[in-house]
From Swiss-Prot:
Name of the gene encoding the protein in the UniProt record: aldC
UniProt keyword Lyase, yes or no: yes
Substrates-to-products reaction catalysed: (2S)-2-acetolactate + H(+) = (R)-acetoin + CO2
Identification of the protein by name: Alpha-acetolactate decarboxylase
Organism: Streptococcus thermophilus
Pathway: Polyol metabolism; (R,R)-butane-2,3-diol biosynthesis; (R,R)-butane-2,3-diol from pyruvate: step 2/3
UniProt GO MF annotations: acetolactate decarboxylase activity
Family membership: Belongs to the alpha-acetolactate decarboxylase family.
Gene disruption: observed consequences: Slower growth in media containing valine, leucine plus isoleucine, or leucine plus valine.
Protein activity control: The enzyme is active only in the presence of branched-chain amino acids. Valine results in much higher activation than leucine or isoleucine.
EC number: 4.1.1.5
Entries under InterPro entries matching the protein: Acetolactate_a_deCO2ase (IPR005128)
Length: 239
């Protein structure tokens, strides 16, 4: 019997929406649980991209994108990683928008109530990303998101990594696709807003189990009061 593929998620997007931005898990510990994934860094300082077992930070700095490899000692308030194992692999040979490609990916799903890991390596006619800016906990995530820098670039090669989440888990994560991008030359990346792919290889991986961890030593998290309805609306708006 093969070993179960576990999606490891630390904390929830709902906690971020409530302003719990302090990092409480190291990147080194995170990478023990998977080689592909995403999240954010301490104080929501940019976008975390995990590709091939390495962690990168993409953020907007003085009007331009900055991508750096993250130290194992850096901490995250929220992240999700998985030991990605492609179950479906197909080649995209012609131009498609993000929505068209997402529909094609979903045509391979054998149900709608399981998580999936997503990896799209290719050449993109257009890529549009944003980065959440570093912030203090007294500003709601949805409000921070209204001033996040966005960047667009044409004719770029790179990899999209992400997680597809079933609707019933909205709040724990964001329902549907949550995707981050990093260029092959490590000069561009961020949270994917939209894109046009020219060609590439798409991989869809199964997830058998959800390993949901919580910041059990963080008193701010332990005693936080969450408005669930508002939290879900904020996730939809911000993500």
């Amino acid at each position: 019997m093969s070993e179960a593929i576990k999606l490891f998620q630390y904390n929830t997007l709902g906690a971020l929406m409530a302003g719990l931005y302090g990092g409480t898990l190291t990147v080194g510990e995170l990478l023990e649980h998977g080689d592909l994934g995403l999240g954010t860094l301490d104080s929501i300082d940019g976008e975390l991209i995990v590709l091939d077992g390495k962690a990168y930070q993409a953020k907007g700095s003085e009007g331009k994108v900055e991508v750096v490899e993250v130290s194992p000692d850096e901490k995250v308030p929220y992240a999700a990683v998985v030991p990605h194992q492609a179950e479906v692999i197909f080649r995209q040979r012609y131009e498609m928008t993000d929505k068209e490609l997402e529909d094609r990916i979903e045509s391979y799903y054998d149900g709608v109530n399981l998580f999936r890991s997503i990896k799209i390596k290719g050449h993109f006619k257009h890529m549009h990303v944003r980065m959440i800016p570093k912030s203090n906990a007294d500003i709601k995530f949805a409000d921070v998101a209204t001033r996040q820098p966005e960047y667009e670039v044409d004719d770029i090669s790179g990899t999209i990594v992400g997680i597809w989440t079933p609707e019933m888990f909205h709040g724990v994560s964001v329902a549907g696709y949550h995707l981050h991008f990093i260029s092959d030359d490590l000069t561009f990346g961020g949270h994917v807003m939209d894109f046009v792919i020219e060609n590439g290889i798409i991989e869809v991986g199964p997830v058998d189990q959800l390993d949901q961890r919580f910041p059990v030593q963080d008193r701010q998290y332990l005693f936080a009061k969450f408005n669930v309805d508002e939290m879900r609306k904020d996730i939809t708006k911000a993500e």
